Curated annotation (Swiss-Prot):
Function of the protein: Binds 16S rRNA, required for the assembly of 30S particles and may also be responsible for determining the conformation of the 16S rRNA at the A site.
GO BP terms, alphabetized: translation
Highest taxon listed in the record's lineage: Bacteria
Keyword hit for Acyltransferase: no
Subunit structure, as described in the record: Part of the 30S ribosomal subunit. Contacts proteins S3 and S10.
Residues annotated to bind Zn(2+): 24, 27, 40, 43
NCBIfam families: PRK08061.1 (NF005974)
InterPro entries hit by this protein: Ribosomal_uS14, Ribosomal_uS14_bact, Ribosomal_uS14_CS, Ribosomal_uS14_sf
GO cellular component: cytoplasm; small ribosomal subunit
PANTHER family hit by this protein: 30S RIBOSOMAL PROTEIN S14, SMALL RIBOSOMAL SUBUNIT PROTEIN US14M
Keywords tagged on the record: Metal-binding, Ribonucleoprotein, Ribosomal protein, RNA-binding, rRNA-binding, Zinc
Name assigned to this protein: Small ribosomal subunit protein uS14
Cofactor(s) essential for the protein: Zn(2+)
Amino acid sequence: MSRTSLEVKAQRKPKFSARAYNRCPICGRPRAYLRKFGLCRICFRNMALRGELPGVRKSSW
């Protein structure tokens, strides 16, 4: 199936609640989803580096 059809399928209410899964709203990626931000790791990193996520900064130690 194409990515767009899978995104539409993920938005529908499943027959059983355990079947529901999260997708990144920007790219539609189903894996590496960060619940706190509602993004996948790749989109999270891009937005954080551009300064679009308030309170997020690159760690350094």
